[in-house]
Amino acid sequence: MAEDFVSVSHLTKRFGDLTVLSDISFSVRKGEFLCVVGPTGCGKTTFLSCLTGAYGVDSGSILLDGEKVDLKKRNIAYIMQEYSTLPWLTVRQNVAFGLTIKKRPRKEAREKVEEVMEKVGLTAFADMYPRQLSASMLQRVSIARAFAVEPELLLMDEPYGQLDIDLRFKLEDELLRLWKASGTTVIFITHNIEEAVYLSQRILILTNKPTSIKDEIPVNLPHPRDVAAADFVALRNRVTEEIRWW
């Protein structure tokens, strides 16, 4: 069994008198794909912001590979629902942006960018600008940029929430291929229960505020998954019922 890579212990986060996250403890194994679901407004994004260190915590600890999270030392990528491409850069330049910041050797960076663009179907669009791309292509750019830096940890905050179902499934399948090939640890926030069951190896279910972990459900289904299969539907219904009734 893989060792724990992310360890969260008794995490509590408040904004003034409002307790958003309350005594949250969980761990994520190295290379695991974890989905986190919960009702709208329960603090899922705050949860990720604490993991990155963007928000301090009022109590508890967050460890990455046994150490406090230090973004200068660790290789963490973050993909949001809002498109985060840089409009003045081409697709190729956007994908290369993280590698440029990290000062990777030019030849190595160029080869990595071309490799990742090929995997997500961006090669033909490499010299275009974000304004020329569709919504799904913009998210492909964000995904390619994230995987280009070969992150230890990839945090995803409802990245496909604005896409229609056909585009979402295509991007989910691309994400799974990249995850399997890279071995990256993924924490994926979503309000879409079917998406969580389709992607993850394990699901954390959050409560309403003050948010805590209500349940942890393993997803022991092989990929590729059939959303109409009886075992898939049963698991989706189980998660739905847990979120519906508090």
Regions found by a protein language model. Name each.
Residues V37-P39:
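The feature captures the beta-strand-to-loop junction immediately N-terminal to the Walker
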Residues Y129-L133, M137:
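Conserved ABC ATPase signature
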Residues R92-T100, R110, E114, P218:
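Short helical segment in ABC ATPase nucleotide-binding domains corresponding to the A-loop/adjacent helical element
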Residues A148-E152:
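A short, proline-enriched helix->beta-strand linker immediately N-terminal to the Walker B motif
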Residues K107-F125, R177:
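Conserved ABC ATPase "signature" region
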Residues T52:
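Helix-to-loop junction immediately C-terminal to a conserved catalytic motif
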